[in-house]
Amino acid sequence: MVNVPKTRKTYCKGKTCRKHTQHKVTQYKAGKASLFAQGKRRYDRKQSGFGGQTKPVFHKKAKTTKKVVLRLECVKCKTRAQLTLKRCKHFELGGEKKQKGQALQF
């Protein structure tokens, strides 16, 4: 279980800051894939008509988790940076700190 606080003081690369400032932490989420990207247009054109599936469908999935990516936004200059964490099954943002001698809760 990885628990990350919602704010963190870290270095800001922004042109106005260039020093350690407070950052707001959120979890990165991939955007919606565009229908007009060249590869998608080509794939849709190839798929249309008769002939079934034209490209291999991936089945050999090996990983059980994804790496967690944090999005750090500077409170002062709004510059955003991304930070990759290690793989984990349970990720929590801004959860309660755990006390000594207590059982884990999911």
Swiss-Prot record:
Signal peptide: none annotated. One of its GO terms (molecular function) is structural constituent of ribosome. Keywords: Antibiotic resistance, Cycloheximide resistance, Cytoplasm, Methylation, Ribonucleoprotein, Ribosomal protein. In wild-type cells, 78% of L42 is monomethylated at both Lys-40 and Lys-55, and 22% are a mixture of species with either residue monomethylated. GO terms for cellular component: cytosol; cytosolic large ribosomal subunit. One of its GO terms (biological process) is response to cycloheximide. It comes from the Eukaryota. The keyword Iron-sulfur does not apply. It holds the Pfam family Ribosomal_L44. InterPro entries: Ribosomal_eL44, Ribosomal_LSU_eL42, Ribosomal_zn-bd. It is found in: Cytoplasm. Component of the large ribosomal subunit (LSU). Mature yeast ribosomes consist of a small (40S) and a large (60S) subunit. The 40S small subunit contains 1 molecule of ribosomal RNA (18S rRNA) and 33 different proteins (encoded by 57 genes). The large 60S subunit contains 3 rRNA molecules (25S, 5.8S and 5S rRNA) and 46 different proteins (encoded by 81 genes). Component of the ribosome, a large ribonucleoprotein complex responsible for the synthesis of proteins in the cell. The small ribosomal subunit (SSU) binds messenger RNAs (mRNAs) and translates the encoded message by selecting cognate aminoacyl-transfer RNA (tRNA) molecules. The large subunit (LSU) contains the ribosomal catalytic site termed the peptidyl transferase center (PTC), which catalyzes the formation of peptide bonds, thereby polymerizing the amino acids delivered by tRNAs into a polypeptide chain. PANTHER family: 60S RIBOSOMAL PROTEIN L36A/L44 (PTHR10369). Present with 13600 molecules/cell in log phase SD medium. This is Large ribosomal subunit protein eL42A. It comes from Saccharomyces cerevisiae (strain ATCC 204508 / S288c) (Baker's yeast).
